[in-house]
Amino acid sequence: MDVSVEIPSCALGEDPENMYATLQEAGWLVVTGLATPAELDAVKSELDPYLAAAEVEADDSEAFYPGHTRRVIALMHRSPTLRQLMTHPTVEQLGDRHLLQNCKKWQLNVSAALQIGPGARDQILHREEDLYDYWAPPRPNLILASMWAISQFTAANGGTQIVPGSHRWAADRVAQPHEIVRAEMPPGAVLFWLGGTLHGGGANLTRDEWRYGVILTYTLGWLRTEENQHLSIPFAEALALPEKTRTRLGFHTDYNGQGLGFYDPSVLLPD
């Protein structure tokens, strides 16, 4: 790790143009203070039963996902608090600036709670936009990713690996060890990174700390999402959600108002 690299960071309330300029340049940004202690406690309370039931994954050195990790997906049904944080004003500001360049509406791509335990190895470096391999890197703006720190993130306990500037690299450039930075941040902070930025979960070198984070990524409204939100949340529950939340969950289509059968899914929602 190149310890000389300063983590680009700011606090809640920073001018959104300044935030996005930093994010565009560095490929990543930490914003502190986005979730309150009460919201963090609520997320823990809502997800604890699911994480307690999740099997701690065994490790396979060649597998994409490291072992010694608990993973829970489909969070929008399981955590009402995360549904609110999913449309946090800072998320909306950065999402609009990054994604509306290539769409009219953008949507949640995937949600997952991750607890990285002692003994976990570094994850393979990858790009969120590798999901859409029709384009070769560097790609157009396709994804904005975020990692919410539910616990403290440190270089030792599994802080996310980031390769600054890699969103501008060609596909065949390989990150060297000195180019990798580990994101450190307090609970309630959010790490944002661009879909083209190389990153991966960090190794947990501690004896007894579990690094707890929630990943929410967003993509263009006309792309197929990695996680099908229409199947992840009961329809009756979706009916009662605010319009902006329904839009982020893909209930309002992006392209010419046309969805499956030329109907926007919103025709099923209340006026």
Indicate where each model-derived feature is located.
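Residues that flank catalytic or metal-binding motifs in active/ligand-binding sites
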Residues: 68, 78, 109-110, 142-144, ...
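Conserved double-stranded beta-helix
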Residues: 169-192, 196-198, 202-271
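A conserved hydrophobic position in a structured secondary element of the catalytic/binding core
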Residues: 77, 86-87, 163, 193, ...
